[in-house]
Amino acid sequence: MDIKKLESYAELIVRVGANIQKGQDVVISAELDQPEFVEMLVEQCYLAGAAEVRVEWTHQPLRLKHVKYQTVERLGEIKDWEKQKLLHRAETLPAMIYIESADPSGLDGLDQEKWGKSVQMRWKVIKPIRDSMENKYQWVIAAAPGKAWAKKVFPELGEAEAVEKLWEAILYTSRAEGDGVKAWQEHNADLKSRCEYLNSLGLRKLHYKSANGTDFTVGLIPQAQFLAGAEDTLGTNVRFNPNIPSEEVFTSPMKGQAEGIVYSTRPLSYRGTMIENFSIRFENGKVTEVKAQKGEDALKTLVNMDEGSKMLGECALVPFDSPIRNSGIMFYNTLFDENAACHLALGDGFANCIKDFENYTLEQCREMGINSSMIHEDFMIGSEDLNITGETESGERVQIFKNGNWAF
């Protein structure tokens, strides 16, 4: 891949994604297989004015070893130095850059029950610290092709060719070719106009129906709003784009208001385990049944992480006619696949989906209906025949999606 293109992509992530501010600290999280691209990111952060850039490396084989050999008690323990690091992060609010490149199946064989219990134990310490940081700092998730990931996406190609092909797909779908800054400005303007229309309707419910069996209704929070694209930090008003790429218009639904069944239309890679061809049934707002042809144990672990993991935290609208879907590529990565189809998310909701959320505490946003959970996992339900009908407070029905695409 042309070095200049990768440098431009790194600059896009830093300046349009995280929007690093002069004098701000930055933390980059990446897999061990990305030293060259991370080096580019570090340089771009400093060129943007960062005071210090730290890199935290991850490696799937090590996680497999840790979970296999450590006790659940040791896995779930947060040492004092770890807690102090988290508290320091909450105080200094560094910008966070996450680079995804891991093998979608790289954690197959992981003891899901053991890992899930350890995460639940750690969450008791992490949650109050994370809550104190809510909406106060910039973050962005972007991607770079790992070798195993590239071979998963393009199994018919050799390793080097697969990596090159995946780089091309990432740059195209991320609007990183040519003038990326201008492309994102235009894209955000389009997303904003759709949010404004949806917010003007006063929707209280969304009903989803498609030929694969999806027949599902979700309630919306009266004080909530649809958001998309760029966000602003609380207090400092720094604009950033948390997902590169992003095609979604989303909101957080009313906790505990969901009825019916939804069928997945794309695989889900959950913590390195593939979950495929699955369905989720909701009654009285909570998951009551899950089925999957592959990865059902992982799916059951997901929905039983805590009370909030059985409920929804997000409803996202993505047209079937989108750049990622039109690429014809199955990425086996939620960052991309969620932007190829309408999706829902189990778990934590977004406080900034409440109108004027800056005037409320996080707890007040929860009381209005924003779900709380240690997880937030997107799964795709969009199809070319998906119809979504909105219902307003007065009972008026409005067509939102028709045959997989915007109806307006």
Could you say what each language-model-derived stretch is?
Residues 251-307:
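Long, well-ordered mid-to-C-terminal structural blocks that present hydrophobic/aromatic surfaces
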Residues 11, 199-201, 271-273, 308, ...:
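Short solvent-exposed loop/turn micro-motifs enriched in small/polar/acidic residues
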Residues 289-358:
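Dual-mode signal for accessory low-complexity, basic/Gly-rich regions
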Residues 109, 152-154, 274, 302, ...:
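Short conserved micro-motifs at the rims of enzyme active sites and ligand-binding pockets
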Residues 257-259, 275-277, 284-287, 310-314, ...:
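Active-site lining segments that contact anionic ligands and/or coordinate catalytic metals
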Residues 363-408:
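Extended hydrophobic packing segments that form well-structured cores
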Residues 219, 290-291, 401:
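Short linear motifs in exposed loops
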